[in-house]
Amino acid sequence: MKKNSYNATLLLASALVLISSFNALSCFGQEKRVVKQNPKLIIGIAVDQLRSDYIQALQNKLGEKGLKKLMNEGLVYENVTFDLDNIDATAALAVLATGSYPFYNGVTSASVYNQEMIRQQSVFFDKQYIGNSTAGNYSPKALIGTNLADELKAASNNLSKVYSIAPNAEEAILAAGHTADCAIWLDDKTGKWASTTYYRDFPQYVVRQNYDTPLFVDEKKATWTPVYSGGHIDIMPYCKADLLPFSHTFVKDRRIAYPWIKTSPIINKAIVELSKQFIKQGRLGQSGTTDMLQLTLYAGTYQHLSAEESPSELQDIYVRLDQNIEELLSAVDGSVGLHNTIIYLTGTGNTENCVSDLTETVAGEFVGSRCTALLNSYLISLYGQGSWIGSFDNNQIYLNHKTIEQKNLRLADVRHSAAEFVMMFSGVSEVVSADQILHEDNNARLTRLRNSYNKNFGGDLLVELQPGWQFKADDASKPQPQTRHDVAPGPAIIFAPGLVTPKHVTTPIDATEVSPTVAKTIRIRAPSGCKRIPLGFKN
């Protein structure tokens, strides 16, 4: 009897062991099926001035396979904020690509003042390199640290193919970084796809397209008419006018005006068409390694007008942008497969000329040329004859450092004297010197200024006006309304089937959190200047 009981116990124990082993193997098998291989293709899409509220307002005019697909099947952060002053698309794109602000990444705006050459120039101007299909000289050397493209190159031991396409040189170079195969943009004068000899690979199929099928072979093809005419202007709830038909030809002085084209849907269509050639002829995502394609598109106003001056055009830009993204997704799905692709899409957080101020609300105008002329006279009275002012640009006064050195003066002393004088001008609420930004203890206001500043290109004085005041470069120029902070937050979307759970997050996030979150998703290091941790991965 005891023997039978012992045998029964032994059989039961053996059965439990077998069941446990089977369950463990089953769990292991299930876990193995869940783990995905590295993506074949990563596509980063940055859309200049993309607004979350405009996307929501146009839901009834968007298709199901473009922006809606990304938003319905991706992780969506609806409100990305930039802790910056006077933000432009270039500075915003640098923040998104590096996970750090200009104080660390070196890129304050598309155009910067060169103290040595005493002139404005591209932030990426570099005379050591010549252009491909352009007269410009560029390199990414002004970008401090790495970006996402650089980190993918490092992770793959330089095997990944990385390309960037954008309307302008600065945008293309920012996304490409230091180690990409090529950065490509549309040249303002020739309308050809251009690059810089800094990058080693300017694909032959792009060269052929420049000569065989240029962007426009004649003026008649350079036209823009709306998809919809009639009906309400959905993006502007307080505008009572209906959508109006329009036709823009982009011809100026009998030549095609390519800078105008860059503020229309035509540039987005051209970039998507070229990206399809990279996927097809360049075989991106089809070589056994993870490749990357960075695209910059446009969703701002036509010719940089205010929204109320061109509402029909602005709404059409969004409708066509949605169609372009649908076309891109279809091309990717037909070649690499969307299930093998990670896509992230971001806006730039800035809006050019959002709404003009009413005349009654304008308190006054601050004219930069008058300020610098009077300031120069004041410094002459203090320190003697000389050209004391270099430039006034983007709310910043640049002193002439050569004159200060020749007079054997301390730069900090001259900055202090100049700041005290400018502070007496009508409409000025604050004047902050570079020394304060670089060396004084932080407060919330100084932190924002510091984020926006970089010692390599920053001015000596930063001038802030009182509410209602407007900047004018000189008496003949148009007034520039003050930038409103975070007036139009844009989204950040991560589309990664099987890796991220579709979800909408309305809580605002900082723009520097986007890059480490994308890096975590694609399993690479965050860029070298990034100090944030990924969203959704916090303890």
Where is each model-derived feature located?
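Bacterial Sec-dependent N-terminal signal peptides
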Residues: 1-34
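Secreted, luminal/periplasmic, and some membrane-associated catalytic domains
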Residues: 78, 88, 110-136, 145, ...
